[in-house]
Amino acid sequence: MIRCVSLAIARVLVFEMIVAGSVAAEPGQWPRWRGPDDSGSTATGNPPVRWNPEQVVWKRRLPGKGCSTPILWNDRIYVTAPADGRDALLALDPSGERLWQTAFGSENPGKHRNGSGCNPSPATDGAGLFVYFKSGTLAAVAFDGKIRWQTNLVERFGPDTLFWDHGTSPVLTERFVIMTRMHKGESWVAAFDKGTGEMVWKTPRNYETPVEGDHGYATPLVIQHEGSEALMVWGAQHLTIHDLGDGRVVWTCGGFNPEGNELWPSIATPVVIDGMAVVAFGRNDRGNPRLHGIRLGGSGDVTATHRAWLRTDIGTFVPSPVAYRGRVYLVGDQGRVACIDPATGRSDWEDAFPKGSAKFYASPLIAGGRLHAPREDGVVFVAEIHDGFRLVANNAMGESIIGSPVPSGDRLYLRGVDHLYCVGSR
């Protein structure tokens, strides 16, 4: 990593590259599921390492089972959950008191044991809130809970054919809220006007793949491409970059599954760091991982020219990678941990969390210089990662955790399937 560049400057550069179209997030804000720069990390704050009942600042029961990640904006916590058979968005204050609850249409419950009808996380641009649910409801909501507009993408474009539960979260640009659908059938990327909900463009995105290879659950990223704001989409075994004006594909990279493996959906969201997209693919959960380093830049089909490196010995199936201080960190589905140089793909170090029968579904977080990784059984591991790996805590929450942890100063928010927790300083 380049240690001579100050952390403050590095964070600004990453922010400018990735967060085009969003308002600048102050420390403690977490406007979407992987944070203000989509890295899954923060350089500010110092959330707790170990906690006991006295350090659980509050615990609030949610109205139904959910797997989305909360977001934070201006001392408010926003989280989706089903309520009385309907999709809902909740707002809480820092004490955990519910300020309002807004309901939409009927819930479409999850099929997977670790899925729900509200896997996608909310997003905010500082002017309003945007939500999407498995039922197809896409909505814009004011900070007082009033619905500005809503539409149903299942009613408009038909149901998805995903084997499991929709997980892609809304993506915000200066003008648009963007949604994607990657499945067997008509797959697409669509942009909707943030103010009115009117669809501005819809671009087909269809590729022939082996069985389930065209199923996608990852969330797109807004990046800077050749000097312009663009959208990077991972799914159907292709990485594509789209012009935000009309949705057309301006860059594409394939070659992710030349062996034709079946049952390889796209789940983990890539990270972008130092001009490289790091893409976790394959079936790490079945001992067949893939980790790709793809150089960005250029135009057209770059499959033959921009594939920088490939690892076949390490990866992650569900948890998304984290970018932090010039390195990419992986937490595999069974707890293997690695710190990787994105330029070469080589590991600085590898280690593992304690083995157990449960797997990792939540995407990890780096905050306070430490790695926070919830396991599906509710154990939240915390490890020091400076100059190697050192496990420092395992905190048992007592309920399953699928949503990713969210930092805010000296606090950490954890979304269990039934409760929302705040741990840290009071």
Residue positions per predicted region:
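Bacterial N-terminal signal peptides
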Residues: 8-20
